[in-house]
């Protein structure tokens, strides 16, 4: 009986501890929200999208928040697990109709948008392919959450037109300066 009470008390105290961000974030763009989240990665006027193994539909790298995790760290972790990419997480761009938070993310290594990205071992259960797509090549029927396809296009289009999606001659897309 005492052991069960101790375990329950320990768990409650663990979840009550303050959250620390255990992921790289753009200085000045830190966000303390907790939510399911993902990354919008833009380079050379293309977006990085995953083909989900079950259903074959496209979507952003991202997923479900873990206990005590910040939304920006959820986006970072899920992108690392599903796409094998280490990113720096920037500003929150949108909250989708299903509550999913979309963050602007920047790869920490140069990316070649003319090549598919290999699916990492950690992503193989959920992801069948990773690639770069122009927005004009996408359609609602091929989008995982079809009911928010137009919202995604609007968010990605605005990000491409803003200073957060600067196109560069090099293969890297650096986070904005503070």
Where are these regions (language model features)?
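N-terminal signal peptide c-region/cleavage motif recognized by signal peptidases
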Residues: 16-18
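A short gly/proline-enriched turn/hairpin at secondary-structure junctions
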Residues: 58-63
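Acidic, metal-coordinating catalytic segment for phosphate/diphosphate chemistry
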Residues: 20-38
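Bacterial N-terminal signal peptides that target proteins for export
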Residues: 1-8
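Charged phosphate-binding loop/patch that engages nucleotide di/tri-phosphates or the phosphate backbone
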Residues: 147-178
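Entry beta-strands of beta-propeller and related beta-repeat scaffolds
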Residues: 46-47
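Unchanged
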Residues: 65-88, 95-148, 176-178
């Amino acid at each position: 009986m005492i052991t069960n009470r101790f375990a329950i008390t320990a768990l409650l105290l663990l979840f009550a501890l303050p959250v620390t961000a255990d992921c790289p974030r753009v200085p000045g763009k830190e966000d303390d929200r907790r939510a399911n989240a993902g990354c919008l990665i833009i380079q050379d006027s293309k977006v990085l999208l995953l083909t989900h193994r079950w259903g074959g539909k496209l979507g952003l790298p991202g997923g479900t928040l873990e206990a005590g995790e910040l939304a920006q760290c959820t986006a970072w972790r899920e992108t690392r697990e599903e796409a094998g990419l280490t990113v720096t997480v920037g500003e929150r761009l949108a909250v989708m109709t299903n509550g999913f938070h979309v963050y602007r993310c920047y790869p920490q290594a140069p990316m070649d948008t003319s090549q598919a990205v290999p699916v990492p071992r950690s992503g193989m259960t959920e992801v069948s392919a990773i690639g770069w797509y122009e927005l004009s090549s996408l359609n609602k029927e091929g989008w995982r959450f079809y009911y928010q396809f137009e919202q995604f296009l609007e968010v990605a289009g605005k990000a491409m037109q803003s200073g957060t999606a600067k196109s560069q001659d090099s293969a890297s897309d650096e986070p904005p300066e503070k």
